[in-house]
């Protein structure tokens, strides 16, 4: 009788051990696992979803003559103001605008009904700190 009770317990333990050994192989999104921020994987989609409507390829819709869909536009220096400054989030106007509490400066503007999540803001900050490599 003891043997019958221990068999299910041993099987349960074996299954639990097997499942526990598989946990590290579960694919967690690269955004949280990879300390290196990849522009195409982590940044481009956020810019496309939240910024390109007003700062993208459509010249008729573009605001402030700013393009964030091209490397040239994203790093241009317009009167000492640059959207992204590699290695320097505090000098990056785009980062300042997405993190400000001032509704007059906030991007995307509140009336657009778009906003960046804290995770998206953090990824952009880390990307800038890591050199803002454009791909």
Each model region followed by its residue ranges:
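Bacterial N-terminal signal peptides that target proteins for export
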Residues: 2-15
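Aromatic- and Gly/Pro-enriched helix-to-coil junctions and flexible linker segments
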Residues: 2, 26-135
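Bacterial N-terminal signal peptides
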Residues: 14-24
């Amino acid at each position: 009788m003891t043997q019958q009770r221990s068999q299910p317990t041993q099987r349960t333990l074996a299954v639990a051990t097997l499942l526990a050994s598989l946990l590290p192989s579960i694919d967690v999104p690269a955004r949280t696992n990879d300390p290196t921020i990849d522009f195409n994987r982590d940044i481009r989609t956020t810019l496309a979803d939240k910024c390109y409507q007003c700062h993208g390829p459509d010249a008729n819709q573009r605001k402030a003559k700013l393009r964030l869909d091209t490397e040239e536009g994203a790093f241009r220096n317009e009167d000492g103001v640059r959207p992204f400054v590699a290695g320097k989030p505090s000098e990056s106007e785009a980062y300042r605008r997405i993190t400000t509490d001032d509704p007059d400066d906030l991007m995307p503007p509140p009336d657009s009904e778009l906003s960046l999540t804290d995770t998206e803001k953090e990824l952009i900050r880390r990307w800038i700190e890591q050199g803002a490599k454009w791909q």
